[in-house]
Amino acid sequence: MELYLDTANVAEVERLARIYPLAGVTTNPSIIAAGKVPVWDVLPRLQKAVGPEGTLFAQTMSRDAQGMVEEAKRLSNAVPGIVVKIPVTAEGLAAIKLLKKEGIPTLGTAVYSASQGLLAALAGAKYVAPYVNRVDAQGGDGIRMVQELQSLLEMHAPESKVLAASFKTPRQALDCLLAGCEAITLPLDVAQQMLGTPAVESAIEKFEQDWNNAFGALNL
């Protein structure tokens, strides 16, 4: 199972990489734009933050296949090993096929249906990213869509992985993992909610109080 952070905040990646078993970091144009640091400056810093074993994801901006391929090559040259995110449109599918031949790994992004995700995988995408909460927000069932996509990939494109994205709660992420997803990417707030249960602190404080009352110290 691969756990990613969905952010371009270098300081937060450095902080959480010490704590979480991270596989890397995913970004998108909106995330990069929010940080107001040019993509060619922030990507090397993020790569350093996740370490040599971490994987970095960044997205193209062109709308046509040839432009996507050219941008993907620039990204791959700037950050060796990067996985290039390609929106799963008609032109995006064409770009994924071309990049597969070039040996540049891709992630099919902006996936709102299982059929769309399957096409990306069949075209050669290494990862497929269904948007769980965004599907829910449109009146759909994001978890069910992920379940269907996971089953389809297992049957027809086992070399591709579902990398589920767009979460508002830890429960959504856990449901995707229970559906068999091999990878998820979490925004910072959801990642921290996974450890931020008030009951945990209450339990620790009770342990400390009992220990201190018995031994007059808070160490072994």
UniProtKB/Swiss-Prot annotation:
Gene3D superfamilies: Aldolase class I
Catalyzed chemical reaction(s): beta-D-fructose 6-phosphate = dihydroxyacetone + D-glyceraldehyde 3-phosphate
Signal peptide annotation: none
UniProt entry tagged with the keyword Cytoplasm: yes
Active-site residue list: K85
Protein localization: Cytoplasm
GO cellular component: cytoplasm
EC number: 4.1.2.-
Gene Ontology BP terms: fructose metabolic process
UniProt GO MF annotations: fructose 6-phosphate aldolase activity
Keywords assigned: Carbohydrate metabolism, Cytoplasm, Lyase, Schiff base
Main location: cytoplasm
Pfam family, one: TAL_FSA
Highest taxon listed in the record's lineage: Bacteria
HAMAP family reported in the protein's UniProt record: F6P_aldolase
Family according to the record: Belongs to the transaldolase family. Type 3A subfamily.
NCBIfam families, A to Z: fsa_talC_mipB, PRK12653.1
Function field: Catalyzes the reversible formation of fructose 6-phosphate from dihydroxyacetone and D-glyceraldehyde 3-phosphate via an aldolization reaction.
Quaternary assembly: Homodecamer.
Protein name: Fructose-6-phosphate aldolase
Organism: Klebsiella pneumoniae subsp. pneumoniae (strain ATCC 700721 / MGH 78578)
